[in-house]
């Protein structure tokens, strides 16, 4: 019954009409709480789209069988297709088969299995994604983003001490000053040993296997590419340590989850494995600064159906929050929104949508994403651009909110973030900024003293 509800919810998301979203997307906005700036609607923004580019693992399918399907019949169908079952993730509602098709026959096999509704519930390819960072010049701006979201005023109440933020990325360089002493062992979803976690879903068996997988994992305290440390220090760099940076939640702990290697690429399987580790380890806040050009990105619940089952389970049943960068293609995303993923676009110091930020129907929030000062894995200060950095800013505001009131359910944290937002008009939502840019100080006050 539970799996049926999740299935219906995903299907309902596709019934949301374009006209409803556009009807909510006009107008102009209230003044920011502690300054006189406003979010500005972009002028002449065109819904730029392009032909989808499907980058995926060759000859690999992710298959979620129907709960009522006979296991022997499913096994026979897989054998008849002349492929190989190379792995299984999760159990029960999260059971997902990793299937290697006959070489060159992925599309045919996918089409055949998708027609068989009796045995197969969801099928997708294992898509690959890149980190969402934009090259920037070496000129450093001030940490304007902290003032824009009223972080310093929020710190009068809480700095997020000990609240955990999971950074799904290339690992985090725990040895640098800004992350030393606060970066947990974490989890490496890219190794065979660590992927023991994928053998079990939530529950006693999943917890046991998750603990075993975590113990065998070497963790993710080394950044193999560099992107993860930039994201982690944006979120939670230590303050008052004689380094010229501070994270949005400087007291928070970082739980690194390595989902990408030296090439900076990740895929559905790695993220699903990471989410299973979240369920086993009790982590509640996840940031994923990866995307692909619309409509192929993570926001597409149809293309990434198994992954979306995992994300919705983490949100609805485990009480977690997921923050996802909208992407850096400067394109319109037509994918309908989902209640279990918070998609974040990027604005610049002019409080206007950046040229590179994707925007569209799935956007939930916006945050600064241009000229963000953070720390690289070599300990040097960098100024960076990208929705890779707007997403962890909102995730870290959520950490401040949860630290101010640990008893809040995840949906209450989301409601507070939305209610606190600086907007770009009287409309409650726009396709550029979603519900707006969360005000950290206002959100923390709401969490502490009520709406």
Model-derived regions: residue spans:
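N-terminal secretory signal peptides that target proteins for export/translocation
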Residues: 1-9
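Structural recognition of the beta-strand scaffold that forms the well-ordered cores
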Residues: 62, 98, 122-124, 164-167, ...
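Short, small-residue alpha-helix embedded
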Residues: 389-406
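Substrate-binding/access-modulating region of protease and related hydrolase catalytic domains
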Residues: 160-161, 238-242, 256-340, 350-353, ...
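C-terminal segment of classical bacterial N-terminal signal peptides
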Residues: 23-31
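Active-site core segment of subtilase-fold serine proteases
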Residues: 136-253, 270-281, 292-294, 298-302, ...
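Primarily auto-inhibitory N-terminal propeptides
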Residues: 32-136
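Catalytic-core environment of secreted peptidases
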Residues: 194-212, 222, 346-389, 425
